[in-house]
């Protein structure tokens, strides 16, 4: 439209310019000359309009080209958007989609840092965590195989119904695996036991994404040395230093929603203990292999003892038969309950009770060069609220306050004095003793064999799922 108006204006100017020229051609104007002039003007006016039209056509052509290019760009962007949707990398339209895609690409899938600091739940944003080692159940006493469980539709449905529970265990187990791998990269002689425990626990809290009673540490880090087999963690002021000739049992736990992973291993620097570690690891794996639905607990203990006692170890020129520590054992695990009632012996005898479908067990074995029996020794550091205790009236305000702190932060999970210190508690020893005397809290002092002996431990958590047995804490290390 603008092009047409421009052409008309241009024609008017031509008329004004031509009038003087026409008048100069003659003084008298005849009708014929006037007609000629009129035709000439009309012709030139047409030419001007034609020129304007050409310009309009040119502009229209340019607009068409631009529109075509724009459509082409839009089609290309839509194609890119479709590709992004297929890859799950973007959900915007056109340029916005491209921008989103770039942003996501830049961020990428999260990977673990060194040292580990990214929570396990962030590494697996879909909420599905790595499974442990899945094993077929052992044959029954009459020789029948348990392979049918893996294909049974009923058992598959039951297994799927508890998937959320199994998944909580797997998240806690993955945190345990990554923490212990990290610990093995830096633990060395010369470090204090407090330094080792605090560094381990700090990492564990990050990976499990500690959140009150919903996620966190299941019990204090055990770092029992030499003849001490279990339940030692340093209290404030403990100056014990890890030595080259020490044999250290690292036993720590993680939990998600009270689903506890109880898993332990032994650290040594002197190769003279290698056979002792091999014996205990073999015994633990034997216990795991024998465990299963309808298996008697005493049969598991008998198999463990047989394997462990088949080993002899020479330390400093003296030969010892490796003995299982008879008054230590594995145990069933319940929600927020590390010892849920059933015990898995590591020697012949014990309960004839059977393992049941859906149960969770900590299979742990302890080997010793001493008597193979432990007793309470040293200062107590581990405590745990009694799971079955009812309401007990408390008079002392300090004791009441401490119980509230325990209920809010630990519930029925085990804790240690260092953790009370960390919460800002002070002068609590009398209140803690009072809670123990009332039976509300149980103390768990360090358990030791005779002085001069050496003890080792390995432990895994297993899930007795309807379809198979899952060694959920299994890793590449053990």
Curated annotation (Swiss-Prot):
The keyword Protease applies. It comes from Rattus norvegicus. The lineage of its organism: Eukaryota, Metazoa, Chordata, Craniata, Vertebrata. HAMAP family: MetAP_2_euk (MF_03175). Cotranslationally removes the N-terminal methionine from nascent proteins. The N-terminal methionine is often cleaved when the second residue in the primary sequence is small and uncharged (Met-Ala-, Cys, Gly, Pro, Ser, Thr, or Val). One of its GO terms (biological process) is protein processing. InterPro entries: Creatinase/aminopeptidase-like, Met_Aminopeptidase_Type2, Pept_M24, Pept_M24_MAP, Pept_M24A_MAP2, Pept_M24A_MAP2_BS, WH-like_DNA-bd_sf, WH_DNA-bd_sf. It is an enzyme of class 3 (hydrolase). This is Methionine aminopeptidase 2. Glycans are attached at residues 60, 63. Its main location: cytoplasm. One of its GO terms (molecular function) is aminopeptidase activity. Binds 2 divalent metal cations per subunit. Has a high-affinity and a low affinity metal-binding site. The true nature of the physiological cofactor is under debate. The enzyme is active with cobalt, zinc, manganese or divalent iron ions. Most likely, methionine aminopeptidases function as mononuclear Fe(2+)-metalloproteases under physiological conditions, and the catalytically relevant metal-binding site has been assigned to the histidine-containing high-affinity site. O-glycosylated; contains 12 O-linked GlcNAc. Contains approximately 12 O-linked N-acetylglucosamine (GlcNAc) residues. O-glycosylation is required for EIF2S1 binding. PANTHER family: METHIONINE AMINOPEPTIDASE 2. It is found in: Cytoplasm. The modification N-acetylalanine is found at residue 2.
